[in-house]
Amino acid sequence: MGVIQRLDTHTVNQIAAGEVVERPASIVKELLENALDAGATRIDITLAEGGKKLIRIIDNGCGMAADDAELCVERHATSKIRRAEDLMAVQTLGFRGEALPSIAAVSRLVITTRRSIDNQATRVRIDGGERYPIEAVGAPPGTTVQVEDLFFNTPARRKFLRSATAEGSACAEVIWRLAAAYPHVAFSLTQGKQISFRSPGNNKPLETLSAVFGREIISFLLPLSAVAPDGWTLRGFIGSPSLHRNNRNHQNWFVNQRWVRCRILSQAVEEAYHGMLPGGRFPFFVLHLELPPQTIDVNSHPTKQEIKFDRERDVADFTRQTVLQTLRSRPLSRPLWSLASFQSDGAPPTQQLSSDVREKAEGERWRQDRILLYREGALSPTKQELPKSPERSERVERLNSGDFGQGRALYRESSQELPTDCLRESLEETESQSESIRQCLSENLPLHRQEPRAEKECQPVEGLVAGDVAEWIPIGQFRRSYILAEGGDTLYLVDQHAAHERVLYHGLKERYLNEAGVCASQQLLLPVTVTLTPAEFQGAMEAIAELRDAGLIVEHFGGNTLLIRAVPVGLPPGEEKGFFRDILNSLMKGLRDREVIRRAALSSMACRGAVKAGQVMSHAEMGALLQQLARLEGVDTCPHGRPYLLRIDRRELERRFYRS
């Protein structure tokens, strides 16, 4: 007798079920897709023990006739396709005819279904693959699928299931993802005796996203919509750069209404966010991509969660450019990090001050005196002797004596703007600024001020328009790394390296990109050699064009060594190797878009040319840096995405000190 034998039907069904039914969430996904394909507008899901004991899904879809109900549990029986060619143009979520027979093989399955034109419903019951006679019963139009005792006949698989809580969470994740894709469908999830999730089903995407992700994120969402010449459509919402996560769990792609995992598309979105997010953080988005069905392959993965495109690179470029354009056109407001957002202690809230009117008047007098003294140089920590005047002496005396009482510390924001030229006048008196800051000051970039948006609910909780930074008064340095500045009722902490990095990046972008968008290069008098690993060398040789876009001209020098003959204009001397490795690392991570590479090159140049942490800055240099920040278009991070601003509100300080 031969070694190879034909397996019996029961074993074949068990193997097939293992490919489709991995856990309760797999069943929920398959059954929900069937309900959506049936045109349901309301779907109710009930779970017991996370789906291990019971999964019940009730929909108001089209239902099935008695003959179809009996046939639907046969393997590879489906209404979605008729021949192999249909696989390349399938527009439904399900099409293989594997889900129901696979579920029936490892559970106790009951299907009750009725069409609206039928007088009675049909009930199909199967226990572990064993069929029972078909029954005629009474039921409303639609379909109810009940799955009990999952893996009751395969205890070896049942023991690998996780806790009821973990399995229930996985089921809920499947439900809210489909709810986000189908805002016109009302989903409800009941676990135990409580409804844990419900979507409105009113075809309003923002209300659906609010139900799924929480109302607090809505103000950070940016609507996105674009149509490519090929007819591709991209729509949905992306998070502003201030809304980011420590993993990719909140990245949701729906291609032709199907939730998928797509590395190439997610990478395209992340490339668009390059330089806007801190390291190790990922953007939030819910995006819908509509393509002709024949241009994608949805049958390339056992669970249909991964797809293939016939023009993958073009789709990725379309996605990246659309997201980048949306980010660039967002309102120029700066959501700032607040001290309150980092705390979780139980200190009592500060009571409302009883002397607000008096303090406002006193504080405003103190504030105006401080501005005038700063303009005259009296508050600058320099040893230069300044000419005295009776008026200025009186103001200094009032400030130092504390005659204004609490108003000195509790002055309120005035409706009058701080003159934007006061810092500039102080800068003109001092010639000891750092060269890089002075060069950026000479550009005379225009100030920008963004008017508040009409829809209050769409604004960030904390906002700062670009021109407001010009009103800040530098106080000093902390640990030679952070600039302390005051403005209005707020104390600001500025990371000097990250802030200067952003300033230099802005200047480099305008100064060193030629008309073709390529970083201008300068030949090195003495070329620099750099030795690479075999993998790095191979990657560098395959990316010669991208390196040239970044301003680097290299050639092979033997073995795994390259010769750097030219670098971008403005790169500080001695930074050639480090800059080259920065760009090569970006290329090795898969960044191939030329615009992204150019941005990475400018980011590296700005980082290497910026003032470093631990470096002493004069009062004039701090003021110069704040003035340059005021000229930026509402950006609150360094080019690598790290925030450079932290605010401490006056009331937060009062709460910390238990002021009443």
From Swiss-Prot:
Polar residues composition-biased segments: 341-355
Gene Ontology annotations of biological process type: mismatch repair
Pfam families: DNA_mis_repair, HATPase_c_3, MutL_C
Gene3D superfamilies the UniProt entry points to: 3.30.230.10, Histidine kinase-like ATPase, C-terminal domain, MutL, C-terminal domain, dimerisation subdomain, MutL, C-terminal domain, regulatory subdomain
Disulfide bonds: none
The keyword DNA repair is assigned to this record: yes
Cellular component annotations (GO), alphabetically ordered: mismatch repair complex
Bias-annotated ranges (Basic and acidic residues): 385-398
Region described as Disordered: 341-362, 378-398
InterPro entries with a match to the protein in the record: DNA_mismatch_repair_CS (IPR014762), DNA_mismatch_repair_MutL (IPR020667), DNA_mismatch_S5_2-like (IPR013507), HATPase_C_sf (IPR036890), MutL/Mlh/PMS (IPR002099), MutL/Mlh/Pms-like (IPR038973), MutL_C (IPR014790), MutL_C_dimsub (IPR042120)
Alphabetic keyword roster: DNA damage, DNA repair
Superkingdom of origin organism: Bacteria
GO MF term set: ATP binding; ATP hydrolysis activity; ATP-dependent DNA damage sensor activity; mismatched DNA binding
Membership in a protein family: Belongs to the DNA mismatch repair MutL/HexB family.
Protein purpose: This protein is involved in the repair of mismatches in DNA. It is required for dam-dependent methyl-directed DNA mismatch repair. May act as a 'molecular matchmaker', a protein that promotes the formation of a stable complex between two or more DNA-binding proteins in an ATP-dependent manner without itself being part of a final effector complex.
Record protein name field: DNA mismatch repair protein MutL
Organism: Heliobacterium modesticaldum (strain ATCC 51547 / Ice1)
